[in-house]
Amino acid sequence: MARKKESYESLMIKLQDIIEEMESEEISLEGSMKNYEEGIKLCNKMYKVLNEAEAKIKILDGNEEKEFVGNDN
């Protein structure tokens, strides 16, 4: 059975939790290394999610470069 993809937001929350744990003074070197490795994996997943979103946007926009017009209110 296919695994459901995690959202970018849920990956970000996990990464923030890891960062907070690594910033604590109570974590061991081994724990820091484990968290660092997990953080790198999360960053790679997040990068992939962003790349997929960018590809979908390009398809929807017909690969046309358009200038963003924001709302300056």
UniProtKB/Swiss-Prot annotation:
One of its GO terms (molecular function) is exodeoxyribonuclease VII activity. It holds the Pfam family Exonuc_VII_S. InterPro entries: Exonuc_VII_S, Exonuc_VII_ssu_sf. GO terms for cellular component: cytosol; exodeoxyribonuclease VII complex. Its EC number is 3.1.11.6. Keywords: Cytoplasm, Exonuclease, Hydrolase, Nuclease. It catalyses: Exonucleolytic cleavage in either 5'- to 3'- or 3'- to 5'-direction to yield nucleoside 5'-phosphates. The keyword Nuclease applies. One of its GO terms (biological process) is DNA catabolic process. It comes from the Bacteria. It is found in: Cytoplasm. Belongs to the XseB family. HAMAP family: Exonuc_7_S. Bidirectionally degrades single-stranded DNA into large acid-insoluble oligonucleotides, which are then degraded further into small acid-soluble oligonucleotides. NCBIfam families: PRK00977.1-4 (NF002140), xseB (TIGR01280). Heterooligomer composed of large and small subunits. PANTHER family: EXODEOXYRIBONUCLEASE 7 SMALL SUBUNIT. This is Exodeoxyribonuclease 7 small subunit. It comes from Clostridium novyi (strain NT). The lineage of its organism: Bacteria, Bacillati, Bacillota, Clostridia, Eubacteriales. The gene is xseB.
